[in-house]
């Protein structure tokens, strides 16, 4: 909001400078965006009277004038402005004057005629961009007076950012209230006395939507002269607030809007059929607006209508048919309170944002309408003449906002502010803010003023007290708190530690939306039901994710489309699985997922560009599982997954419980998702891994280790992992390492069978093992494999 400093000082005039006033307004919570002079720097410009005005003998577009500036003689000045005429009061730059831009006025001859000064336009004095003609001052302007003094051009404009909760400050009165409260000064309101009706003319008003319009005031004013000139003082106030003067009727309603924050509208009375009806539009109903555009209305749009058609979009924009024009003689003034919810969003729907909608959406003082209509009536009659009828007031009191009654506790006030403010001062601040205050022991009960509908809870009062008391007056007190050393379980593995390990292995962390495209998710999890949002951000973000892979694979595609061929990404976060046994029917699991694509290594002169495979990601995952201390309890089992390659994927089990999966993305899915090349993914339930096995210290053997290799032939479908586990189990006391180092099938091995070459490392912590003991342990392993898997030693 932009306003004139002098206009504000008409309401409240603290004895402080403009800069201090701007700082004070900012500290009161209304951030000042800028303070600017209303006119350029100039001197030597005075009020003059055009005594004579005649045609220049040598130029068609110039006039020769004689100007009275209160001196000993009349000044001869040549002027080219089309509006220059005899009897006009003008702004005269006399010889020696300096105008903005360091332009000095000198005596000169123009086409043979002497000119002893210049008649100035607004643009030449850097007051506005209006350069169509010279300034026309009021007829009663005193001759010879400095124009800067006469027009109060030592004024400044102050522009503030008004937060949504302070709609009461979208008018001079609201800002003035805050300045008055801070400076403990009275508020000086202009004359807003009731205008006594001089005629009995009224217009019937009916409100069919009282919830949307709890109060509607209308007043007939007849016999006005729309062609009357808006007084210069009003035009200047409007200009300094960034409003262009249009005609006196519109200027008056804009003036009241800026002064009181109450939007108003004037209808051409003679164009209203029957009476005014405040109602909701019918779906598809059309209204031609003041700017000539046609608006197709929805059923939730509030309109002001007569008995035949809509006249205006309530609180937003007037209609062309009932708008005031040069032929208007009789008007209906409207001053209403519209429920903010009935206005919010309607203007944007039609690509509009007006001063009225801006205020109504945030809220207008429901007790302001009578004051506004009386103020507008007085100004309109003073400028345009006419006679006013009585005010017609249609109010549904039960639908008007109720003033909140709030209890403020001393304990809460001191705790939130961190400083004790004397009770007398607290009471005084609340009363100066307009609250009705009742002191209840050490506490207060306050009724918020009608214009402060943002005061609703106790914290609002605490904020107001601190704001007016002054944040700078609250002493800085160092925060004192006991440092509590929390216990850390050795078994707890930090997710951050795992993330760091992945980053160390060349991965980058991704953070994707929990809202995903249901179509893409259905490709990954065709058998699982997803949670669909009733109010999604967009159609492709309308489902809650069942796994992290939907977002990660989308991130891979996004990066591949931007020339990133080698990718290593991981993410941790929640998945949302419908589950009737869970709270609210949704099970939320913390998941950890990763994806790799492209080449195994970055481009290097000494390394071949090898594509990644299943085992690259499996190795990285095993490194993470090693941190948990549970790698020995983890099994990778061949199981089908709809999103993964059937021959290059595995389910992950921990102590027999399924916790995730790993594998190459199915080729068909790669095609549908536009993935470029082989992509390998994993996902595990982090909460199953967060408690790690605490490492147990054991003695390092000082005795030599012995390695024995065996090759056993087993059926193709026997997992090598089961073979290794059986060897560990049988040789538990002496076998300290078991490793698979070769797999062979083909010549020399029967069809349907495979040969597994296994190394056994044997060692004892107390002595050196004898050859007979080693052979016996190896024999036990072979026998166990024979009994369980029908294995045989390969020749």
From Swiss-Prot:
Q: Which reaction does it catalyse?
A: tRNA(Phe) + L-phenylalanine + ATP = L-phenylalanyl-tRNA(Phe) + AMP + diphosphate + H(+)
What are the GO cellular component annotations?
A: phenylalanine-tRNA ligase complex
Entry EC number(s): 6.1.1.20
**Residues of the FDX-ACB domain:** 701-794
Biological process terms from the Gene Ontology for this record are: phenylalanyl-tRNA aminoacylation
From what superkingdom does this record's organism come? Bacteria
By its UniProt entry, which InterPro entries does this protein fall under? aa-tRNA-synth_II/BPL/LPL, B3/B4_tRNA-bd, DNA-bd_dom_put_sf, Fdx_antiC-bd, Fdx_antiC-bd_sf, NA-bd_OB-fold, Phe-tRNA-ligase_IIc_bsu, Phe-tRNA-ligase_IIc_bsu_bact
Residues given in the record as Mg(2+) binding sites: 454, 460, 463-464
User: Which chain regions cross the lipid bilayer?
Assistant: none
Please state every residue range assigned to the domain named B5. Answer: 401-476
Kindly state what the record says about how the cofactor is bound: Binds 2 magnesium ions per tetramer.
Q: Which co-factor is required? A: Mg(2+)
Which terms in the Gene Ontology molecular function aspect does this entry carry?
ATP binding; magnesium ion binding; phenylalanine-tRNA ligase activity; tRNA binding
Spell out the subcellular localization from the entry: Cytoplasm
Q: What PROSITE patterns is this protein classified in?
A: B5, FDX_ACB, TRBD
Q: What is its main location?
A: cytoplasm
- Domain called tRNA-binding: residue spans: 39-148
Keyword line: Aminoacyl-tRNA synthetase, ATP-binding, Cytoplasm, Ligase, Magnesium, Metal-binding, Nucleotide-binding, Protein biosynthesis, RNA-binding, tRNA-binding
Outline the subunit composition.
Tetramer of two alpha and two beta subunits.
Family, per entry: Belongs to the phenylalanyl-tRNA synthetase beta subunit family. Type 1 subfamily.
Entries under HAMAP family matching the protein? Phe_tRNA_synth_beta1 (MF_00283)
UniProt xrefs under NCBIfam families? pheT_bact (TIGR00472), YtpR (NF045760)
Kindly provide the name given to this protein in its UniProt entry.
Phenylalanine--tRNA ligase beta subunit
Species in which this protein is naturally found: Yersinia pestis
């Amino acid at each position: 909001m932009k306003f004139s400093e002098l206009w504000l000082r008409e309401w409240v005039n603290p004895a402080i400078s403009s800069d201090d006033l701007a700082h004070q307004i900012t500290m009161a919570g209304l951030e000042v965006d800028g303070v600017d002079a209303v006119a350029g720097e100039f001197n030597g410009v005075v009020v003059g009277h055009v005594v004579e005005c005649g045609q220049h003998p040598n130029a068609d577009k110039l006039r020769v004038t004689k100007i009275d500036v209160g001196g000993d003689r009349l000044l001869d000045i040549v002027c080219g402005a089309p509006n220059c005429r005899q009897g006009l009061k003008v702004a005269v730059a006399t010889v020696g004057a300096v105008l903005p831009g360091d332009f000095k006025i000198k005596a000169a001859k123009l086409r043979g005629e002497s000119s002893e000064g210049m008649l100035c336009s607004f643009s030449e004095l850097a007051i506005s961009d209006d350069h169509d003609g010279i300034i026309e001052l009021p007829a009663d302007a005193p001759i010879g007076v400095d124009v800067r003094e006469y027009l109060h051009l030592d004024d400044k404009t102050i522009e503030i950012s008004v937060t949504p909760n302070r709609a009461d400050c979208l008018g001079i009165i609201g800002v003035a209230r805050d300045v008055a409260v801070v400076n403990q000064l009275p508020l000086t309101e202009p004359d807003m006395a009731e205008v006594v009706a001089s005629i009995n003319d009224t217009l019937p008003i009916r409100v069919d939507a009282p919830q949307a319009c709890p109060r509607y005031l209308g007043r007939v004013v007849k016999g006005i002269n729309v062609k009357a000139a808006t007084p210069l003082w009003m035009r200047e106030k409007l200009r300094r607030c960034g409003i262009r003067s249009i005609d006196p009727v519109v200027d008056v309603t804009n003036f009241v809007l800026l002064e009181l924050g109450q939007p108003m509208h004037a209808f051409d009375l003679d164009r209203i059929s029957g009476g005014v009806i405040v109602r909701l539009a019918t779906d598809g109903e059309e209204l031609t607006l003041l700017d000539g555009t046609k608006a197709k209305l929805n059923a939730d749009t509030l309109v002001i209508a007569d008995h035949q058609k809509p006249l205006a979009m309530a609180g937003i924009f007037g209609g062309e048919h009932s708008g005031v024009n040069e032929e208007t003689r009789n008007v209906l003034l409207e001053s209403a309170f519209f429920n903010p919810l009935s206005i919010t969003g309607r203007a944007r729907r039609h690509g509009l944002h007006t001063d009225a909608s801006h205020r109504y959406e945030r809220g207008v003082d429901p007790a302001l309408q009578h004051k506004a209509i009386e103020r507008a009536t007085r100004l309109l009659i003073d400028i345009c003449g006419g006679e006013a009828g009585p005010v017609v007031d249609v109010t549904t009191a039960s639908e008007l906002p109720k003033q909140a009654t709030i209890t403020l506790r001393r304990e809460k006030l001191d705790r939130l502010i961190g400083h004790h403010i004397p009770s007398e001062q607290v009471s005084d601040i609340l009363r100066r803010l307009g609250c009705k205050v009742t002191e209840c022991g050490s506490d207060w009960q306050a009724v918020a003023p009608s214009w402060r509908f943002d005061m609703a809870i106790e914290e609002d009062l605490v904020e107001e007290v601190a704001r007016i008391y002054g944040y700078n007056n609250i002493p800085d007190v160092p925060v004192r708190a006991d440092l509590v050393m929390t216990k850390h379980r050795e078994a707890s593995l930090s997710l951050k530690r795992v993330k760091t390990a992945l980053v160390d292995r060349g991965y980058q962390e991704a953070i994707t939306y929990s809202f995903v495209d249901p179509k893409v998710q259905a490709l990954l999890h065709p058998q699982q039901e997803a949670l669909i949002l009733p109010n999604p951000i967009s159609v492709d973000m309308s489902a809650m994710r069942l796994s992290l892979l939907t977002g990660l694979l989308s991130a891979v595609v996004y990066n591949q489309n931007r020339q990133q061929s080698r990718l290593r990404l991981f993410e941790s976060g929640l998945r949302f699985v419908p589950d009737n046994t869970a709270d609210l029917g949704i099970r939320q699991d913390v998941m950890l997922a990763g994806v790799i694509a492209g080449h195994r290594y970055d481009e290097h002169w000494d390394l071949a560009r090898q594509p990644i495979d299943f085992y690259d990601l499996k190795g990285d995952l095993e490194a993470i599982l090693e941190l948990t201390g549970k790698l020995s309890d983890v099994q990778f089992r061949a199981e089908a997954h709809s999103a993964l390659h059937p021959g290059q994927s595995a389910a992950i089990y921990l102590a027999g419980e399924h916790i995730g999966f790993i594998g190459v993305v199915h080729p068909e899915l790669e095609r549908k998702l536009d993935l470029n090349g082989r992509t390998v993914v994993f996902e595990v339930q982090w909460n199953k891994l967060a408690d790690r096995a605490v490492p147990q210290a054991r003695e390092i053997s000082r005795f030599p280790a012995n390695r024995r290799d065996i090759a056993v032939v087993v059926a193709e479908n026997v997992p090598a992992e089961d073979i290794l586990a059986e060897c560990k189990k049988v040789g538990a006391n002496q076998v300290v390492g078991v490793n698979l180092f070769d797999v062979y099938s083909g010549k020399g091995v029967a069809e349907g069978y495979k040969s597994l070459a296994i190394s056994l490392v044997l060692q004892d912590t107390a002595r050196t093992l004898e050859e007979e003991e080693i052979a016996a342990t190896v024999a036990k392993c072979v026998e166990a494999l024979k009994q369980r898997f029908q294995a045989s030693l390969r020749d």
